[in-house]
From Swiss-Prot:
The gene is feoB. This is Fe(2+) transporter FeoB. The chain crosses the membrane at residues 282-302, 309-329, 344-366, 383-403, 427-447, 453-473, 518-538, 664-684, 691-711, 722-742. Belongs to the TRAFAC class TrmE-Era-EngA-EngB-Septin-like GTPase superfamily. FeoB GTPase (TC 9.A.8) family. GTP 2 binds at residues 35-39.
Length: 773
């Protein structure tokens, strides 16, 4: 079979990602475009004659880049197409918005690259009474047009057949430009490198005349003749760029008049009716908050019901199973304990997180595909404008509920460096999926019937602190106003199940692999560090271990937030959590369990793998039956509680160590707001600079310590009024000084992003890494 590389390009919200998932299924690899952290997705699929590598290009409305501050997505798409890496392009076009989508199509066809138009979302177009003559459109464009409904898989085989039959586009003159424009474009093309095809050289000439700044990188000596060409044109026309765009729009209007009835189309009645409620100035925000509450409620409720299968099952396989193998094969005791408690315990810490994190990713994917996520940005526009940010900056922040890394990377879609940087600084405060796992464990141990409210309040606190951080930056070191907010609101539709599953699987797989590597290594390290004293002797009591000795020295620093000296395990959790927040649960589980080790030894004669696995399935089935009972819906934390008797087990020890719900909640505030994990730090450094990464870390530590201290000292004021008053005044005074210093430093701060100064011409090459972080 012949190998073929195809670029998939289209407008945002045209169904491009759904088509990508339909074609490639699970055969996807996620990496980065070289030199930048914008995600690059590649997939594999086969046709009758070809083995295809499909490259999913960022969504863009055109290939024209007027300003260096424009979204990097447009730059990447343009450079990839001009690089010649793609043998063929598939242009995904939204049939319900044909006129707007055809602008990009015309630019692609003018380049002369073999192109297939995938006319998607025909089901939505039909509901709006839009009729499109496919054959007439194909004849007008001079390339194959394949009707599709990617959410239902309709037209996929026809698209594969068109790929096998692909050839050069027919030589159809699509756009009629004014003769002076063509003359100057041809004069520029003559002095461009001769290895570029003539058609592409003329296209580059028109792009340069339109004001596209990145086409100059390919034009060679022609860029030196540009000013003279523009001067000659201005003697004959007012604005060359306007004439070029107008010629294209006239061509599009002529095509649409012949092939469709878009002028008599009816807007979606369902979308219009729902938007009257969802976008209502009074109801929009409460509905958004309810959707966010519903997201983590279902994640905890259904995910918690599935947890026994992963928890009890992994204990049976990786802890008791390894112990049984060790005793049966007569391993040394130390090796059996090391493998079962270190390796097996680490795996057992990761797997129970899967159901809840997976449900959250599934819910986020549903919101994105259904069209609600764009509405959330619209609803939050007024609030974001108050911060000097456009409403669409809230979209990457919402993505932060799943993981902060793509949230930081998503700031690339914003136009101005100031807006990108402010969004990057706000992103780490959005509560990610890993923090949800921590909140669920603490809620089960400390908050009982108020568990759901406690977790919801932490989510809202993260949003509030992100907003306050934006306000602080706006009035200190990043003054300015937001750019005008224009964003497409796609029609509501039911997401395709296959697409949802693939998106959820890709996110969950990345989480498990990333978390698993770190948690297992940390669990093994902690198990070893717990077994020896500072002098190197083996200890029987964890409180005599080297880890305990070192942690006790540091723990008094956290006394103002409610972490007492004997609760040194909580301090270790904070330090390991800087590597990855999901490690906090594993750390506390390892350390609190070690302190509560029972004298009862494992008996291999009583071990029955089948019975333990059956018990896991049975417990999961019972949990699923109870999931939607009224009591569980009122208190979803109960579904994931996991440890019914709080007097025993790791959760019981944790309950005793913290001593009060106030201390536990204060600890959670600190976990929510303090330093982001290593992968997020790396993303911040790559998207901005190491200096801004350092600022993000220090600012996060400051507000985490300040807010946690204020909460705990107010909650426990009656127990030690003098100490609490001193702590409260110290925190307030310190932050007044910090804000004052930031205001004075405003004139010396460079908000230009490091990433915007990078050469974008290198973005066409694929990153060799498969990790999107």
């Amino acid at each position: 079979m012949k190998k073929l590389t195809i670029g998939l390009i289209g407008n945002p919200n045209s169904g491009k990602t759904t088509l990508f998932n339909q074609l490639t299924g699970a055969r996807q690899r996620v990496g980065n475009w070289a030199g930048v952290t914008v995600e690059r997705k590649e997939g594999q699929f086969s046709t009758t004659d070809h083995q295809v590598t499909l490259v999913d290009l960022p969504g863009t409305y055109s290939l024209t880049t007027i300003s260096s501050q424009t979204s990097l997505d447009e730059q990447i798409a343009c450079h990839y197409i001009l690089s010649g890496d793609a043998d063929l392009l598939i242009n995904v076009v939204d049939a319900s918005n044909l006129e707007r989508n055809l602008y990009l199509t015309l630019q692609l066809l003018e380049l002369g690259i073999p192109c297939i138009v995938a006319l998607n979302m025909l089901d939505i177009a039909e509901k709006q009474n839009i009729r499109i003559e496919i054959d007439a459109l194909s004849a007008r464009l001079g390339c194959p047009v394949i009707p599709l409904v990617s959410t239902r898989g309709r037209g996929i085989e026809a698209l594969k057949l068109a790929i096998d039959r692909y050839k050069a586009n027919e030589n159809v003159e699509l756009v009629h430009y004014a003769q002076p424009l063509l003359n100057e474009a041809d004069s520029l093309a003559k002095v461009m490198p001769s290895d570029i095809p003539l058609k592409q050289r003329r296209w580059l000439g028109l792009q340069m005349l339109e004001g596209d700044i990145y086409s100059r990188a390919y034009a060679g000596e022609a860029s030196q003749h540009l000013d003279a060409a523009l001067a000659r044109l201005r003697n004959e026309m007012d604005d060359p760029a306007l004439h070029i765009a107008d010629a294209r729009y006239q061509c599009i209007a002529a095509i649409c008049d012949v092939v469709s009835n878009t002028l008599t189309a009816e807007p979606s009645r369902f979308t219009t009716a729902v938007d009257k409620i969802v976008l209502n100035r009074f109801l929009g925000l409460p509905i958004f908050l309810f959707v966010m509450y519903l997201m983590f409620l279902l994640a905890i409720n259904i995910g918690g019901a599935l947890q026994p299968l992963f928890d009890v099952g992994s204990v049976a396989l990786f802890v008791h199973g390894i112990q049984w193998i060790g005793y049966t094969l007569h391993f040394p005791d130390w090796l059996t304990i090391f493998l079962a408690q270190g390796l097996g315990g680490g795996i057992n810490t990761v797997l129970p997180l899967v159901p809840q994190i997976g449900m959250m990713y599934l819910f986020l994917s549903f919101l994105e595909d259904s069209g609600y996520m764009a509405r959330a940005a619209f609803v939050m526009d007024r609030l974001m404008q108050a911060l000097g940010l456009p409403g669409k900056s809230f979209v990457p922040l919402i993505v932060g509920f799943g993981c902060n890394v793509p949230s930081v990377m998503g700031a690339r879609t914003l136009d101005a460096p100031r807006e990108r940087l402010m969004t990057i600084m706000m992103a780490p405060f959005m509560s990610c999926g890993a923090r949800l796992a921590i909140f669920a464990v603490f809620a089960a141990a400390f908050f009982g019937q108020n568990g759901a409210l406690a977790v919801f309040s932490l989510y809202m606190l993260g949003i509030v602190m992100a907003v306050l951080t934006g306000l602080m930056l706006k009035y200190t070191i990043m003054r300015g106003e937001a750019t005008p907010f224009v964003m497409e609101l796609p029609v509501y539709h039911v997401p395709h199940v296959k697409s949802l599953i693939i998106q959820t699987w890709q996110r969950l797989k990345g989480f498990v692999l990333r978390a698993g590597k770190v948690i297992i290594i940390v669990s093994i390290f902690l198990s070893a560090f717990n077994s020896f004293s500072l002098s190197g002797k083996i200890v029987d009591n964890i409180n005599d271990s080297a880890l305990a000795s070192v942690s006790r020295v540091i723990t008094p620093v956290f006394k103002p937030i409610g972490v007492h000296e004997d609760n040194w395990q909580a301090t270790v959790g904070l330090f390991t959590g800087a590597m990855a927040k999901e490690v906090v649960v594993g750390t506390l589980n390892t350390l609190y369990t070690a302190e509560n080790i029972q004298d009862e030894e494992f008996n291999p004669a009583e071990f029955n793998l089948g019975e333990e696995l059956f018990s896991a399935v049975d417990e999961t089935w019972q949990s699923l039956k109870d999931t939607f009972s009224l009591s569980v819906l009122m208190n979803p934390i109960e579904a994931s509680k996991g440890d019914g008797e709080m007097g025993t087990g790791a959760m019981g020890v944790m309950d005793q160590k913290f001593g009060s719900a106030a201390a536990a909640y204060s600890y959670l505030i600190f976990v929510l707001l303090y330093v982001p994990c290593i992968s997020v730090m790396g993303a911040i450094a790559r998207e901005s600079s190491r200096g801004w990464m350092g600022f993000s870390i220090l600012w996060g530590l400051n507000i985490a310590y300040s807010l946690a201290t204020l909460f705990y000292q107010v909650a426990s004021y009656s127990q030690h009024p003098t100490y609490s008053l001193v702590c409260i005044l110290a925190v307030i005074l310190f932050n007044i000084v910090v804000i004052g210093l930031l205001r004075r430093a405003r004139s010396r701060v460079d908000i230009e992003l490091l990433a915007t100064r990078k050469s974008v011409s290198s973005c066409c090459a694929a990153s060799t890494t498969g990790d999107c972080h």
